[in-house]
């Protein structure tokens, strides 16, 4: 019944006098998205301007590179000058503005990251460790030189006259057993004034850190009555601080980390191999406080006569140990050096 009704409707529609034939007419759609559902007018140049497609709103539809490609090219060339692409072009100006905005954004990110790290460091080192836990806090600043002059605190712990005396005796012993000195200068030795033995003309000492060190600030809570051997700067009723050196010891850092998590291997390690931690002396005590391992070097001079000078160098650790002894002599207007003694030779 439904099929019969559809057939009658179709037949009556085709017999209508205004309907001559049926045909499918293709529509000519424009590339412009605003005419996606409608037919553009015959003349729309005034509305569209010179850019027919909306995807070319910032670029020209002439097959040239777009703004992103220009920005990448400008970035690779390392220049902000828009004349590299096209002088005075709008695309270059837009690309330059976007590139400048990206750089400013990167700078802001780095500034924010640096300020955040600084705030966390100060908050943890001063606010938490010093004020809350009442502990000393060390803030590293820059790497320090391994060779330096001994401080006043170091000189209080080093017996310089004893080092000078022992080194003098060791040098005289080396010279007295050397064949060249025996033949040319005689034994016992005398200086140009006939003094026996020749006296030390100059003697210097310096310190050399055993491990790499960093210079930084050590900060603690203000306590004027706290005993100390160092000179501290104060922020009254708040903090005390001073500049110091700290070694970078990987094994000690690992040991401290293990102790923090409840593990420890130092006792067993000391029993098995004590020289690895405390040196070659079995009963040597560990270094207390904020002191660290260092070598004490010395350099001295002995004047045998007006043309001969003895220079010796060595290291002090519990006992004096000579490294090298040289003889400098003026021969025919030339300065000649003779190596009289060198360690392991």
From Swiss-Prot:
Q: How does it sit in the membrane?
A: Single-pass membrane protein
Family, as annotated: Belongs to the AIM39 family.
The UniProt record lists the keyword Repeat:
no
Of the GO CC terms on this record, one is: mitochondrial membrane
Report the transit peptide positions. 1-29
* Species whose genome carries this gene: Vanderwaltozyma polyspora (strain ATCC 22028 / DSM 70294 / BCRC 21397 / CBS 2163 / NBRC 10782 / NRRL Y-8283 / UCD 57-17) (Kluyveromyces polysporus)
- Its recorded name reads Altered inheritance of mitochondria protein 39, mitochondrial
Keyword check for Mitochondrion = yes
- What segments bear the compositional bias annotation Polar residues? 64-75
Q: Where are the transmembrane segments?
A: 113-133
Region annotated Disordered, chain positions? 46-91
Going by the UniProt record, its keywords in alphabetical order are: Membrane, Mitochondrion, Transit peptide, Transmembrane, Transmembrane helix
């Amino acid at each position: 019944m439904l099929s019969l009704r559809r057939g009658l409707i179709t037949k009556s529609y085709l017999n209508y006098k205004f309907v001559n034939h049926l045909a499918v007419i293709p529509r000519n759609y424009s590339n412009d998205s605003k005419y996606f559902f409608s037919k553009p007018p015959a003349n729309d140049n005034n509305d569209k301007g010179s850019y027919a497609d909306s995807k070319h709103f910032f670029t020209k539809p002439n097959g040239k590179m777009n703004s992103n490609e220009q920005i990448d090219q400008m970035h690779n060339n390392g220049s902000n000058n828009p004349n590299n692409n096209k002088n005075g072009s709008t695309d270059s100006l837009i690309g330059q503005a976007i590139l400048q905005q990206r750089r400013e954004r990167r700078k802001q990110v780095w500034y924010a990251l640096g300020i955040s790290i600084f705030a966390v460091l100060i908050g943890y080192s001063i606010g938490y460790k010093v004020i809350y836990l009442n502990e000393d806090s060390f803030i590293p600043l820059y790497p320090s030189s391994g060779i330096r002059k001994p401080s006043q605190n170091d000189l209080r712990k080093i017996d310089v006259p004893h080092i000078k005396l022992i080194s003098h005796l060791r040098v005289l012993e080396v010279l007295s057993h050397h064949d060249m000195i025996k033949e040319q200068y005689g034994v016992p030795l005398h200086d140009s004034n006939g003094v026996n033995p020749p006296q030390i003309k100059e003697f210097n000492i310096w310190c050399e850190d055993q491990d790499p060190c960093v210079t930084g600030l050590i900060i603690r809570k203000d306590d004027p009555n706290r005993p100390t051997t160092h000179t501290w700067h104060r922020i009254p009723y708040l903090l005390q601080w001073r500049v110091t050196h700290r070694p970078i010891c990987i094994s000690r850092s690992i040991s401290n980390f293990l102790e923090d998590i409840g593990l420890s291997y130092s006792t067993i390690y000391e029993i098995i191999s004590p020289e690895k931690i405390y040196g070659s002396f079995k009963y040597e005590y560990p270094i207390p406080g904020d002191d660290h391992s260092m070598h004490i070097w010395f350099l001295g001079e002995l004047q045998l006569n007006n043309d001969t000078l003895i220079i010796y160098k060595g290291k002090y650790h519990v006992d004096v140990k000579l490294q090298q002894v040289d003889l400098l002599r003026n021969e025919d207007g030339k300065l000649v050096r003779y190596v009289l003694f060198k360690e392991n030779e």
